[in-house]
Amino acid sequence: MKDKAQNIGLRMVQEFASTEALSDKFLIFDNYTSPMEHLGTFAITGHPVKLDSLLIVICSEGYARLIVGFEEITVLENHFLIVMEGKPFEVLELSKNFKAELMCLKESLFELQGSHILRFLHLIRENPCQPVLASKKQEFEVLLKCLKQTMTDTGNKFRQQNLQYYLY
């Protein structure tokens, strides 16, 4: 990796992706309802970046090849990757048919959840790329749809509580 990673804030990602965000703690978007070039020019920067939030990539088609920390990882179809807050990563390659849901969220969103979230985060640090089990794929898709619908419902004053409920 290069000497210095570029720091990117959640607000910068929100503006670039033209998506709705929940304060400075959560946003969700995809790369297939908008042109691929839009995400591609952001994702393949030629240098490592660090986000000020967790990045979750849920690949539904194709693949992406990244370096996370010092480890090269390939996110395949029906896999998800979690990059911890502040960890440097670089996107090396995206397949032409790459489709993914992307979520950025601050660890502070989990403040009220106690020690079981900390155990989960520790597990993810050890194994950042996991398959979406076939038995859970439909459930995963419904959850993502609920998260997206909740984000677009800007008139709902309980939006943050609903998102936290879905994520826990």
What are these regions (language model features)?
Residues 59-61, 76, 84, 94:
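A short, compositionally biased micro-patch
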Residues 153-166:
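All-alpha amphipathic helical-bundle segments outside canonical DNA-binding/catalytic cores
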Residues 61, 85-87, 105-107:
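Residues immediately flanking
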Residues 42, 77-78, 86:
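Tight coil/turn sites that cap or link beta-strands
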Residues 2-3, 16-19, 91-153:
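A hydrophobic/aromatic-rich effector-binding and dimerization subdomain
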Residues 1-64, 73:
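Generic protein-terminus/edge-of-domain signal
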Residues 70-82:
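Short acidic-glycine-tyrosine-enriched beta hairpin
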Residues 65-67, 83, 89-95:
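Short beta-strand His + acidic residue motifs that chelate non-heme Fe in jelly-roll/DSBH
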